[in-house]
């Protein structure tokens, strides 16, 4: 979805323009708020794959789940394999191998873009292990970061949050259209519905 990609790129560019190379004044752990660990295995979600709640995994696929574990503005990080960071606004669920976090003080969008900006560093420095690499959460929480002042954050959020809200709205609308297509297409194919001029 090109519109969503463009909105995300605009948000990222705004973050980089506003905060890149700012001197550290805190640690990542100062702003992170951890959501509860999910009891849901990816296999269970793949088998069910029903409902209308997005289900985030440590892979690229976003599955479906019948009930939300969280709501609001949340980041979803892989805990094994390779670093990846996803962001979603609204009700969502996630697998046991996904670390779901948000941020204190209206900093969730900032947190997501910060993590996205250090994604190569996440992969190289904070994923360790001999076989399957795992995210080293304590090390990541100890990473120095710039924590914006309230006025800076307000200005940033007024610009960026509507873009992420629009992305979430576009995703939900696309899902509704896919559901309508999946319901209507079989009816058209077997003659239960016809299209008239």
Task: Please give the residue ranges for each predicted region.
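Non-catalytic DNA-recognition/assembly elements of restriction-modification systems
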Residues: 1-59, 150-196
């Amino acid at each position: 979805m090109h519109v969503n990609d463009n909105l995300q790129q605009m948000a990222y560019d705004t973050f980089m323009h506003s905060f890149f190379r700012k001197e550290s004044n805190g640690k990542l752990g100062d702003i992170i708020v951890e959501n509860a660990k999910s009891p849901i295995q990816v296999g269970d979600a793949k088998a069910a794959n029903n409902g209308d709640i997005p289900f985030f995994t440590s892979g690229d696929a976003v599955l479906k789940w019948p009930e939300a574990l969280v709501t609001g503005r949340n980041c979803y990080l892989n805990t094994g394999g390779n670093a990846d960071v996803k962001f979603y606004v609204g009700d969502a669920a996630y697998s046991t191998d996904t670390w779901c976090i948000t941020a204190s003080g209206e900093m969730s969008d900032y947190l997501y873009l910060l993590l996205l900006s250090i994604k190569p560093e996440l992969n190289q420095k904070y994923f360790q292990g001999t076989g399957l690499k795992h995210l080293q959460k304590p090390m990541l929480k100890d990473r120095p970061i710039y924590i914006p002042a309230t006025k800076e954050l307000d200005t940033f959020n007024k610009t960026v949050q509507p873009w992420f809200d629009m992305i979430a709205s576009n995703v939900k609308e696309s899902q509704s259209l896919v559901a309508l297509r999946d319901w209507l297409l079989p009816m058209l194919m077997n003659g239960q519905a016809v299209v008239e001029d």
